Amino acid sequence: MTCPKCGWVHYENPAPTVQAWIDRDGSFLALRRNEQPLKGQWNMPGGFVEAGESGPEAIAREVREETGLAIEVVEVIGIFASTYGDGDDALPIFDVAYRCRISDGDGSGALEISAESSEARWFPLAEFPRPAFAGERQALALLREFSG
């Protein structure tokens, strides 16, 4: 979009986001959304990257805020062009999915979910519910494909 008065060009670039697939002995953590968009659906800990953050820094912050867990990134699962929300108000995003593990002491980590979520559960890949967002569904498909 170009400003008709000054000629400045505004580019509709996607916002960078991150999602964490926290692996605990083959089960992965999902959070039930407690706010819109897609309230009541399952999704992964994650969110928007803040200015000056790297992807691993952003996912560590988001996981700590949403679950109280300290994590470390194991690998990148994939990078997906997607949207946050539905319909005309959907925001284009560039979503990086990380496979992570708990780094708190013995790895058990005590969950302390934020008000953003109403529930947290660990699911094996075979029983994992349909994630709320397209990028999460793509990451789940890749995890299932490469898990054996």
Across the structure, where does each feature detected by a protein language model lie?
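Acidic, metal-coordinating catalytic segment for phosphate/diphosphate chemistry
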Residues: 1-19
